[in-house]
Amino acid sequence: MNNLLLVALGGSIGAVFRYLISIFMIQVFGSSFPFGTLLVNVLGSFLMGVIYALGQMSHISPELKALIGVGLLGALTTFSTFSNETLLLMQEGDWLKAALNVVLNLSLCLFMVYLGQQLVFSRI
């Protein structure tokens, strides 16, 4: 299958997952903090680490990397939403939540990429 179609297919799945996860997190925790965006970014970062490590070890095809790594995870994770939600918190004067959002997204996402890679490298 053409890689462009695989990216489009993965992207449509990732976008739907992001939407459903965000709605679920608002229902569970409310809308005072962007937990949905945090969760999709952390989960997507972990999965990106796994996909990257598997790709480095030639255990997945370029087509699967296009489907999952570029398409699904590219649509699942979202830097633009993270940035907008952080700015909104700042504009509302909630500097603590804005700072917490930045620190949590950056530190947890970096750690999850590392963890995903280490999990794969230690098992294979």
Curated annotation (Swiss-Prot):
Species, as recorded: Shewanella sp. (strain ANA-3)
TM stretches of this protein: 4-24, 35-55, 60-80, 102-122
Its biological purpose: Fluoride-specific ion channel. Important for reducing fluoride concentration in the cell, thus reducing its toxicity.
Principal location: membrane
Protein name in the entry: Fluoride-specific ion channel FluC
Compartments, as annotated in UniProt: Cell inner membrane
Keywords: Cell inner membrane, Cell membrane, Ion channel, Ion transport, Membrane, Metal-binding, Sodium, Transmembrane, Transmembrane helix, Transport
Residues that coordinate or bind Na(+): 74, 77
Similarity section: Belongs to the fluoride channel Fluc/FEX (TC 1.A.43) family.
